[in-house]
Amino acid sequence: MRPLAIVGPTGVGKSELALDVIERLGGQVSVEIVNADAMQLYRGMDIGTAKLPVAARRGIPHHQLDVLDVTETATVASYQRTAAADIEAIAARGAVPVVVGGSMLYVQSLLDDWSFPGTDPAVRVRWEQQLAEVGVVRLHAELARRDLAAAAAILPTDGRRTVRALEVVELTGKPFAASAPRIGAPRWDTVIVGLDCDRTILSERLARRIDSMFGQGLVDEVRMLLRWGLRDGVTASRALGYAQVLTALDAGGDADHLDEARQQTYLGHRRYARRQRSWFHRDHRVHWLDVGTVDRVGVVDDALRVWRNAS
């Protein structure tokens, strides 16, 4: 069978469906999962990323989980390199890789074999200094002056991506988008299945998920990660849920501040889900399944049908 990728917005049930689909195969083929959720790369970031515990993985090998310390910076280029090596190794063992996750750039960099523009430390440092001196809003305005399309695609609060875009524009003399790949045949001839559901249903699922995260001990998890150096982590400290709890703890960590963190975490997940929907629905290669109108068994059947027919 061809490799499979399961994508879609956060909270839609990608991890569980992947396990159900693999179990339904009943051992006909050997299957291994490759994670494509950027924040699940981090050790200790379990509750807030809805990472499946080892006991819940049903004995199925998982890759790209718990491979970074929270002080390390996650990058698309590094993920692409190591995840691609995992997929090649899985295939070499005669097994089938299943990519599962919703981190948009991570998924596309892997399936479309992106090439990344070079970097110049001196240029990068200069733009980082500008960021520190003038702030992200003014630096984002400078990006808009140089490359309006790039500025429109990058949130005005995202200093790291703004710096990278300015670096690429300066080094290449071309718009940032010129270095992005065009969508073609997916790498390894991967079959891509997308999961989605009505927005109201997903919002309810997200509300339950956030309540569960806080109920299971997200705040204590953040306190533990602070001892591991979370504040020094460029990407880990900005993860949804973790950033909001950090803000609440900095403000004193009382019940009101933690309630605000919970609400902001929920709203952040809703915004992120909208962005994921928009991103993945632009990809004509995705076979979409509605998980809100079909029962779990039916969705598994549909996913298997798509996978087998494509193979």
Curated annotation (Swiss-Prot):
Binding residue positions for ATP: 8-15
Subunit structure: Monomer.
Keywords linked to the UniProt accession: ATP-binding, Magnesium, Nucleotide-binding, Transferase, tRNA processing
A Pfam family: IPPT
NCBIfam families in alphabetical order: miaA
Site (Interaction with substrate tRNA): 103, 124
One Gene Ontology molecular-function label: ATP binding
Residues that bind substrate: 10-15
Role description: Catalyzes the transfer of a dimethylallyl group onto the adenine at position 37 in tRNAs that read codons beginning with uridine, leading to the formation of N6-(dimethylallyl)adenosine (i(6)A).
Requisite cofactors: Mg(2+)
Record GO biological process: tRNA modification
Family designation: Belongs to the IPP transferase family.
Name of the protein this chain belongs to: tRNA dimethylallyltransferase
Native source species: Mycobacterium leprae (strain TN)
Source organism superkingdom: Bacteria
SUPFAM superfamilies: P-loop containing nucleoside triphosphate hydrolases (SSF52540)
